[in-house]
Amino acid sequence: MSSSSDAIKAALEKGRAAGLSATGGKNADYIPFLASVPSDLFGLAVVTADGQTFKTGDADFAFAIESISKVFTLALVMEEIGPDSVREKVGADPTGLPFNSVIALELHNGKSLSPLVNAGAIATASLVPGDTADARWNNILECQCGFAGRRLKLSNEVNQSEQTTNFHNRAIAWLLYSAGTCYSDPMEAVDIYTRQCSTLVTATDLATMGATLAAGGVNPISGKRMVSAGNVAPILAEMTMEGLYTASGDWAYTVGLPGKSGVGGGIMAVVPGELAIAAFSPPLDPAGNSVKAMAAVAAVADSLGHNLYTTRGKVSS
């Protein structure tokens, strides 16, 4: 169902109202930089599969991409080795556990299960093509820039803040390595993973990146193909299963769209063939998802009638 410009503008207003009225949550405080971001910021954007952009609020405020970066590194690696190899080497199942849990590793002989939780994302980072750590990082950054349709930058402040507190991720990497499921030097993989989470994006960027997936892998602004059309479906499937951490099932149940969140306060949701919705607000719920961004994206999707599990048209009784 294609949405008109007027319908999208009206949906943005509803999303803005829903986001601003949502209460609760607090900034992530285990990463010093994230704790310092003003908690009253709120931005919302929609980018369509044909390149139209709509936005409101602080949609151009730059914040840390954090775990949303996992989607695009997954796309990069999937292009390199294919979805079947990703499923074999990293996994393709929900864990039902917090994003930084090691329990799934212990229960499944060191296999991470999902590329959208920390263990799987570190394993995915270890599969990024490149002869050196810097080459691998540059490939990730170029991928993110291609999806966003503009030059993105690594925040040294965010990266340093994360590098000094990522002991848990280092432990995860060694567990992966001991099981043979980290495919490069484990500390190099953690370094690359940490850097990929430290890129600065805006809600408008995230909507463009999501719209690239909605458009079958082609950036609707630049026209550049970023991922094969055949790889989009498994990426969106992973987003559905694990995109909002332990709230992924509830999100699928209530909103019905593939989504991905990050502890920087961003959320991106994709309507295949149509558009992407993205929002930003720093205060998070206990699962690590932005309270206001979730409410805003859900309201926009509902206003436009975008739920992949809703039957449309005439149905025989």
Curated annotation (Swiss-Prot):
<protein>
    <recommendedName>
        <fullName>Glutaminase</fullName>
        <ecNumber>3.5.1.2</ecNumber>
    </recommendedName>
</protein>
<comment type="similarity">
    <text>Belongs to the glutaminase family.</text>
</comment>
<comment type="subunit">
    <text>Homotetramer.</text>
</comment>
<dbReference type="GO" id="GO:0004359">
    <property type="term" value="F:glutaminase activity"/>
</dbReference>
<dbReference type="InterPro" id="IPR015868">
    <property type="entry name" value="Glutaminase"/>
</dbReference>
<feature type="binding site">
    <location>
        <position position="162"/>
    </location>
    <ligand>
        <name>substrate</name>
    </ligand>
</feature>
<feature type="binding site">
    <location>
        <position position="245"/>
    </location>
    <ligand>
        <name>substrate</name>
    </ligand>
</feature>
<dbReference type="Pfam" id="PF04960">
    <property type="entry name" value="Glutaminase"/>
</dbReference>
<dbReference type="InterPro" id="IPR012338">
    <property type="entry name" value="Beta-lactam/transpept-like"/>
</dbReference>
<feature type="binding site">
    <location>
        <position position="263"/>
    </location>
    <ligand>
        <name>substrate</name>
    </ligand>
</feature>
<keyword id="KW-0378">Hydrolase</keyword>
<dbReference type="GO" id="GO:0006537">
    <property type="term" value="P:glutamate biosynthetic process"/>
</dbReference>
<feature type="binding site">
    <location>
        <position position="193"/>
    </location>
    <ligand>
        <name>substrate</name>
    </ligand>
</feature>
<dbReference type="GO" id="GO:0006543">
    <property type="term" value="P:glutamine catabolic process"/>
</dbReference>
<feature type="binding site">
    <location>
        <position position="118"/>
    </location>
    <ligand>
        <name>substrate</name>
    </ligand>
</feature>
<feature type="binding site">
    <location>
        <position position="67"/>
    </location>
    <ligand>
        <name>substrate</name>
    </ligand>
</feature>
<feature type="binding site">
    <location>
        <position position="169"/>
    </location>
    <ligand>
        <name>substrate</name>
    </ligand>
</feature>
